[in-house]
Amino acid sequence: MALSRRLRLRLCARLPDFFLLLLFRGCVIEAVNLKSSNRNPVVHEFESVELSCIITDSQTNDPRIEWKKIQDGQTTYVYFDNKIQGDLAGRTDVFGKTSLRIWNVTRSDSAIYRCEVVALNDRKEVDELTIELIVQVKPVAPVCRVPKAVPVGKAATLQCQESEGYPRPYYSWYRNDVPLPTDSRANPRFQNSSFHVNSETGTLVFSAVHKEDSGQYYCIASNDAGAARCEGQDMEVYDLNIAGIIGGVLVVLIVLAVITMGICCAYRRGCFISSKQDGESYKSPGKHEGVNYIRTSEEGDFRHKSSFVI
């Protein structure tokens, strides 16, 4: 008797919890709810990816499912009226009734995708969730610019650029297949060099080159999707020939002096005068035949005298 009385008391004490549980379950079942196994999938270009959208609770046997793509402020349909739409047609299918599988993804597939479910038999008829898809792109061979020759003690800049990779790649430089540190002072092996590598911009800057900096240089662009390198290019560091430079300057000065003296001598000899008039070379106008010129008493007054020639 005492045992059955205690059991009845326990059951009575638990009755309110039981009814609350039924009420709670009724509320959940009457509202459609969604979940995803991965809200932020990351995939490499040309691979496949699943966009998970799972109905956890619903009383509607055949809810309406729609997928939309949100990119650059524009919203387009991906799955509507039980059909794949837009540029995903032909490489996307539906699995698990509400989830999407995209084959051969491209960089243009990077976007926010929204799964929308309408369950008309549920008290809460609509639920939605968003998934952000990131497509990583492997870098292509970067463009490298390496000076062919630099004099000792001068500054030099080597450049490396790549524009296809996503996320944005980082850069590393190699000399004769040996990786260069970001700062030459950080490695005793490069104590005779003075350079700095910017892994974000891809520049390798020498403040002053030394003979030891001669060699073959190449750059590698890397990100989470892969890496690519440019072809190696040689850079020669040479000594300045001071004696040769001084000799060349002297030769130029001597040549200029000789040319100047030649011009002066030619000018003195009259080579640059086109015509010359003096007393010896001047000729008076010839007399006209049949006309005599008679000077009168007044200076410079001339008059004509006619004559006949028989």
Swiss-Prot record:
SUPFAM superfamilies reported for this sequence: Immunoglobulin
InterPro entries: Ig-like_dom, Ig-like_dom_sf, Ig-like_fold, Ig_sub, Ig_sub2, Ig_V-set, JAM-C
Gene3D superfamilies the record matches: Immunoglobulins (2.60.40.10)
Glycosylation sites: N104, N192
Membrane-topology descriptor: Single-pass type I membrane protein
Residue stretches spanning the membrane: 242-262
Cellular compartments per GO CC: bicellular tight junction; cell-cell contact zone; cell-cell junction; desmosome; extracellular space; filamentous actin; microvillus; paranodal junction
Lipidation (S-palmitoyl cysteine): C264, C265
Compartments where found: Cell membrane; Cell junction; Cell junction, Desmosome; Cell junction, Tight junction
Stretch forming the signal peptide: 1-31
Top-level taxonomic group: Eukaryota
GO biological process entries: adaptive immune response; adherens junction assembly; angiogenesis; apical protein localization; axon regeneration; cell adhesion; cell migration; cell-cell adhesion
Gene Ontology MF term list: cell-cell adhesion mediator activity; identical protein binding; integrin binding; protein heterodimerization activity; protein homodimerization activity
Side Cytoplasmic, residues: 263-310
Pfam families xrefs: Ig_3 (PF13927), V-set (PF07686)
Residues covered by the Ig-like V-type domain: 35-127
SS bond list: C53-C115, C160-C219
Annotated keywords: Cell adhesion, Cell junction, Cell membrane, Differentiation, Disulfide bond, Glycoprotein, Immunoglobulin domain, Lipoprotein, Membrane, Palmitate, Secreted, Signal, Spermatogenesis, Tight junction, Transmembrane, Transmembrane helix
Protein's UniProt keywords contain Oxidoreductase: no
Comment block on domains: The Ig-like V-type domain mediates interaction with JAM2.
Quaternary structure, from the entry: Interacts with ITGAM. Interacts with GORASP2.
Family the UniProt entry places it in: Belongs to the immunoglobulin superfamily.
Function of the protein: Junctional adhesion protein that mediates heterotypic cell-cell interactions with its cognate receptor JAM2 to regulate different cellular processes. Plays a role in homing and mobilization of hematopoietic stem and progenitor cells within the bone marrow. At the surface of bone marrow stromal cells, it contributes to the retention of the hematopoietic stem and progenitor cells expressing JAM3. Plays a central role in leukocytes extravasation by facilitating transmigration through the endothelium.
Protein name as catalogued: Junctional adhesion molecule C
